[in-house]
A protein has these predicted regions:
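Active-site flanking loop/helix segments enriched in acidic
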Residues: 70-104, 141-146
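Amphipathic alpha-helical segments in well-structured domains
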Residues: 98, 150-158
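Short alpha-helical scaffolding segments that buttress acidic/His motifs in well-ordered protein cores
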Residues: 69-81, 131-135, 178-186, 213-217
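Post-HExxH zinc-binding segment in Zn-dependent metallohydrolases
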Residues: 159-174
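Alpha-helix N-cap and coil->helix boundary residues
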Residues: 152, 173-177
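His-Asp-centered metal-binding catalytic motifs of divalent-metal-dependent phosphohydrolases/nucleases
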Residues: 101, 127-145, 157, 180-186
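Divalent metal-dependent phosphate-bond-processing catalytic cores, especially two-metal-ion Mg2+/Mn2+ enzymes
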Residues: 2-56, 92, 104-126, 137, ...
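Eukaryote-specific, low-hydrophobicity, charge-rich regions
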Residues: 47-75
């Protein structure tokens, strides 16, 4: 018989930046539903937190990324509202998940600046904007189902996005980078993505480094003690109609351990600054005790 884990994780002392991030993630949950701020407003706040203003950006291709990012945030919000009104918005892959990933990605990008001495400010700014765009769109068109083939949903997201990126004036090179990064969010790619940056000087101008930040942002709310129980319950609900057996495993000791040990990987300097491995390892120890 499966052993189920408590939905009330023990309190954990968090580093100050992590505690601040958790506070903002919890504010999202308080707003979710009747007081929801909307993805476009959140997207603007992420740019503000990074100090990126379209009217002060010098590069035309970066301006295009910002415009497309904000436009798609509005479009995704509008589409999701229609889904929600028809009770069709996925339980996990909802606007709340995208908001989580945007907030976590913003924090990782901000902290990553401390670990880079790259003098090319404009290139870093461009990559940060691309990172936010991928955080917003990595699950574009997700219907709440499970991959039946490797990369099935990720490929579909790219196919749906390419025309929108083209219409948004995104360069061919950046369209390719966005799709590469989305394809690398496929779960079977994650461990290799992290291996690829071993012994590298971490630099988000390197696609492999930016990829790791996106992977970390994607699952961070499912690791943090104040948010993971709700995230796990939402994913189980979403998967219930597609694969009841897998859904039932998520909140068991075995299921949680498997996720923490195999999927919840953190290797960027920014994630180390947030203490994410310590948080994860503490929970693993508690589950094994």
């Amino acid at each position: 018989m499966a052993t189920y884990i408590s939905q009330k994780p023990p309190k954990t002392m968090l580093p100050a930046p992590t505690a601040d991030l958790v506070s903002r993630l919890l504010e999202l949950r308080q707003a979710w539903g009747t007081h929801w701020i909307g993805l476009e407003t959140l997207a603007r706040s992420c740019l503000d937190r990074l100090g990126i203003r379209a009217d002060r950006v010098a590069r035309a291709d970066t301006k295009a990324v910002i415009r497309c990012f904000l436009s798609l945030a509005g479009q995704i919000e509008a589409q999701a509202i229609v889904q929600a009104q028809a009770s069709e918005e996925p339980a996990y892959h909802s606007r709340l998940h995208l908001a989580d990933v945007l907030l976590c990605m913003t924090e990782l990008l901000l902290l990553s600046r401390s670990f880079s001495d790259d003098p090319n400010h404009m290139q870093r700014e461009h990559e940060e904007c691309l990172g936010l765009l991928v955080a917003l769109t990595h699950d574009y068109g997700h219907d709440g189902s499970i991959n039946r083939a490797i990369g099935q949903l990720e490929k579909r997201s790219c196919e749906l996005l390419i025309p929108l990126l083209n219409e948004g004036g995104i360069s061919e090179q950046d369209r390719l980078r966005v799709c590469q990064l989305i394809l690398l969010t496929e779960p079977s790619c994650i461990s290799n993505n992290h291996r690829n940056i071993i012994n590298k000087i971490f630099d988000i101008n390197d696609l492999e480094c930016l990829c790791v930040l996106i992977n970390e942002a994607d699952i961070m709310a499912s690791v943090l003690p104040d948010t993971w129980p709700e995230r796990t319950a939402a994913l189980a609900k979403e998967w219930q109609s597609h694969s009841p057996q897998i859904a039932a495993q998520l909140n068991t000791h075995v299921g949680r351990l498997t996720f923490l040990q195999k999927a919840a990987l953190f290797s960027s300097p920014a994630s180390q600054a947030l203490g994410l491995n310590e948080i994860k390892n503490k929970e693993i120890s508690q589950l094994l005790s």
